[in-house]
């Protein structure tokens, strides 16, 4: 029997209709895996050994009562075959410390999804720089004068922090906007933090597409998140409307170009954000949208993921 651990935010607080981690747990349980539930505070390191207080978990598709704990134990993480790191951002120093603990288990043979080193290496905004032929025009800087020059060149730009999620602190600055200075100061904290600027993509009106990639293979359907009511951001967390769709030719091209790098880096479950035919983000920490896509199309993304995990465990 495969022992699967999951590190996640409190399961009591999730919305099971939309929660991708919950979908993964349902599929793992369907396959007869033993489920071990952990929150960040359950992980610890003693004399170099990664351990955790885990609770054995049962899950069910029931909106009143979707989980129950059926046991608890303290064990070496290396006793688990696979651990899903599904803690939501912020990607802060605490998150990084957790990846070091998980890495100690990985060295003993536990498969960590996604690979701890790659979680540290691949910032969701900055990792796109390795695929700059696929992205919008992009500037990463602390320098207000450079941001101003970029804005003057493109006259309509998006500014965002490198560590936000769910559309937090994303600004659109159009031609003639008097607020560029204060936005630049806010995002860079007066020149002490990097931020990202990209030219505005009018295709956002048709949606910001979340394309999922499982062990290098694109899922054939995506979720387009469409901004509502004059909003620039499509993120569901910012009120966007989700619309599942088949991938377009350009979606396939982007996903296939990036897929081999993701696989090689042990990034087994990744969400690409694509606007029009441009790649804007590579989400590696805790990508979502599984349930919305599976509800609309005949595809089991969690099945693809567990197949990929089982294939890696047999290697």
Swiss-Prot record:
Mg(2+) binds at residues 281, 283. Keywords: ATP-binding, Glutathione biosynthesis, Ligase, Magnesium, Manganese, Metal-binding, Nucleotide-binding. It catalyses: gamma-L-glutamyl-L-cysteine + glycine + ATP = glutathione + ADP + phosphate + H(+). Its cofactor is Mg(2+); Mn(2+). It comes from the Bacteria. GO terms for molecular function: ATP binding; glutathione synthase activity; metal ion binding. This is Glutathione synthetase.
């Amino acid at each position: 029997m495969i022992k699967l651990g999951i590190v996640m935010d409190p399961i009591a607080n999730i919305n099971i209709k939309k929660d991708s981690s919950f979908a993964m747990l349902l599929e793992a349980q369907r396959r007869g895996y033993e489920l071990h539930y952990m929150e960040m505070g359950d992980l610890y390191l003693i004399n170099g050994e990664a351990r955790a207080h885990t609770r054995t978990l049962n899950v069910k598709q029931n909106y009143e009562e979707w989980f129950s704990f059926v046991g608890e134990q303290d064990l070496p993480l290396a006793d688990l075959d696979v651990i899903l790191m599904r803690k939501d951002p912020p990607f802060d120093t605490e998150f990084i410390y957790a990846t070091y603990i998980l890495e100690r288990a990985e060295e003993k043979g536990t498969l960590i999804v996604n690979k701890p080193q790659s979680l540290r290496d691949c910032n969701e905004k900055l990792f796109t720089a390795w695929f700059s032929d696929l992205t919008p025009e992009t500037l990463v800087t602390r320098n207000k004068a450079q941001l101003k020059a970029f804005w003057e060149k493109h006259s309509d730009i998006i500014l965002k922090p490198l560590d936000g999620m769910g559309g937090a602190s994303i600004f659109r600055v159009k031609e003639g906007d008097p607020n560029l200075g204060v936005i630049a100061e806010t995002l860079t904290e007066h020149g002490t933090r990097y931020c990202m600027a990209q030219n505005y993509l009018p295709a956002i009106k048709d949606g910001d597409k979340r394309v999922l990639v499982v062990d290098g293979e694109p899922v054939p359907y995506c979720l387009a998140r469409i901004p509502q009511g004059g909003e620039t951001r499509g993120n569901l967390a910012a009120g966007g409307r989700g619309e599942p769709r088949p991938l377009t030719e350009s979606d396939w091209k982007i996903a296939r170009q990036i897929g081999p790098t993701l696989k090689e880096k042990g990034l087994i479950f990744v969400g690409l954000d694509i606007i029009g035919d441009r790649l804007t983000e590579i989400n590696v920490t805790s990508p979502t949208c599984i349930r919305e896509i599976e509800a609309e199309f005949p595809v089991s993304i969690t099945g693809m993921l567990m197949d990929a995990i089982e294939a890696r465990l047999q290697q």
